[in-house]
Amino acid sequence: EIRPLPDRAGTGAPFSLRIQELEHLSDLTWPADEIEEIGKWRLRISDGFTMRANSVLPTGAAPFGEPNLDIEKAVDEVVKIYQEKGLTPTFTLPLPLYEELDNYLGDIGWGVKVGAEYLVNDITDNLDLESADFQIVISTEPTLEWLEVQSDHQLERIMRNYPARYGQIKFENKTIAIGRIATFGKRSLATRVFVNPEFRGKGIGALLMRALMAAAKGDGATKVGLQVDSENGAGLALYKSMGFRFHHFYNYRVLSDVSK
């Protein structure tokens, strides 16, 4: 069970518990089609389109997350299960909590597919949503127009498996930015945030995030998190300019030799 933490995002409880709570939020609001378990390892299995819903999330104590098998046997079982499903064996590894597991997998040939930062922020009362040029639309489901922006049709089933708000920014009746935000208790998580490259640098990303945070606030959230590829310098700069703070890093590690 994940214990509730203090109100200010990213502070208060022991760091390991804060990491676990945020990763639980990510897991809960982006639910996989199927879950198998090896002790306290959650094997998330879907259609392969998104790494989060198709990867192992350790949830137990460090250093390895408490699989109920010897670490070598547990990893072999992960490989077997994912390959039987036609999926690439993948781990989501929050750091530094599971740094030893991350290093172990690296030593036996698992490569880093993506490294990302988990950012957090508090949702304030004064969210400026005024715009003379752009229209904000918030809905409770992903419309066809929303899905078409990033060709997210394959994600629709996963997204509909948890209640969320879907934001759009429109210019001259054309959708130029989208995002999703889902709330659990006082915490919310923003995902699938995207701005049409032709409209970047105009404050649209910040406007979209404020609109999403306002929607989450209406659902009871006081805090927001999001995950950003560590190589997305522009995105990291935008969010940090809005007051988002770095909380922790995580790697997606994949089995390099999938014929193993």
Identify the role of each PLM range.
Residues 83-94, 216-227:
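Conserved GNAT acetyl-CoA-binding A-motif
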Residues 57-67, 193-200, 229:
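A short, internal acetyl-CoA/4′-phosphopantetheine-binding micro-motif in the GNAT/acyltransferase core
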Residues 156-197:
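A conserved beta-strand-loop-helix scaffold within acyl/acetyltransferase catalytic domains
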Residues 1-84, 97-98, 102, 158-160:
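N-terminal charged segments
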Residues 1, 34-38, 100-108, 163-179:
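Conserved beta-hairpin
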Residues 71-79, 192-197, 201-218, 237-241:
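Conserved acetyl-CoA-binding loop-helix of GNAT-fold acetyltransferases
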Residues 92-99, 226-236, 253-259:
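Conserved beta-strand-loop-alpha-helix junction that forms the acyl-donor binding cleft
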